[in-house]
Amino acid sequence: MILLVDAGNTNIVLGVYKDKKYIASWRISTEGNKTSDEYSIQIIQLLNLNNLNPEDVKGIIVSSVVPNIMHSLENMLRRCFGQEPIIVGPGIKTGINIKYDNPKEVGADRIVNAVAAFEIYKRPVIIIDFGTATTFCSVTENGDYLGGCICPGLRISADALFERAAKLPRVELEVPKKVICKNTVSSIQSGVLFGYIGQVEYIVKKMKEEMSDGIEPYVIATGGLANLIANETDAIDEVDSDLTLEGLKILYQKNRE
């Protein structure tokens, strides 16, 4: 049984992989001041609730974009499972060629997604990960990671408007029925959501132009808000909610020996 850990700025996603299939996954809040004891309690309870024995965990891999939780997280994993976790970072075997000016700058989450997309789809891909930040990454059919761009996430964009404009309320991230709205809440939703959709469509268009080699890139979306955006645009070909966990599984298999 393999434990997959994806630590993001907002949530930590945990997955369990056994007998060539996922048998459970959970999402817990990322908290920088949480101790290894607190993480231990959470993860053991989650395993027990799913009738999974912690002693059956034979391998662990971790991807993190939150440096200040890594000490607690690694200590917890070593203590709970008696395993040295594989950490996604410089020196790990990926099977892709990172064509970045400085490959060490590429976030672990982007590497994991790129590996998964390359191994699964076997064609040029654009990966959009809708997280705290939204990342766009391009990978060729030969496994060259070309780079991409990073944008403020959808929630960050909405929260910034609420925090900096005194008379505007915080709103739920819901797509309104029309662009032209007749109340403040719907007007904010229209501007934030449709504006973000337009941003996604334009960035995808420009990335496709720069990747043009005769094969149309396949656009994959993942992350917590992927379905919300994908339902409103033809720029996204597929939503793959398990892309990151799949990438972690692939990287574990490449690096377990």
Swiss-Prot record:
It catalyses: (R)-pantothenate + ATP = (R)-4'-phosphopantothenate + ADP + H(+). SUPFAM superfamilies: Actin-like ATPase domain. Its EC number is 2.7.1.33. A monovalent cation. Ammonium or potassium. One of its GO terms (molecular function) is pantothenate kinase activity. Pathway: Cofactor biosynthesis; coenzyme A biosynthesis; CoA from (R)-pantothenate: step 1/5. Belongs to the type III pantothenate kinase family. This is Type III pantothenate kinase. It comes from Clostridium botulinum (strain Eklund 17B / Type B). The lineage of its organism: Bacteria, Bacillati, Bacillota, Clostridia, Eubacteriales.
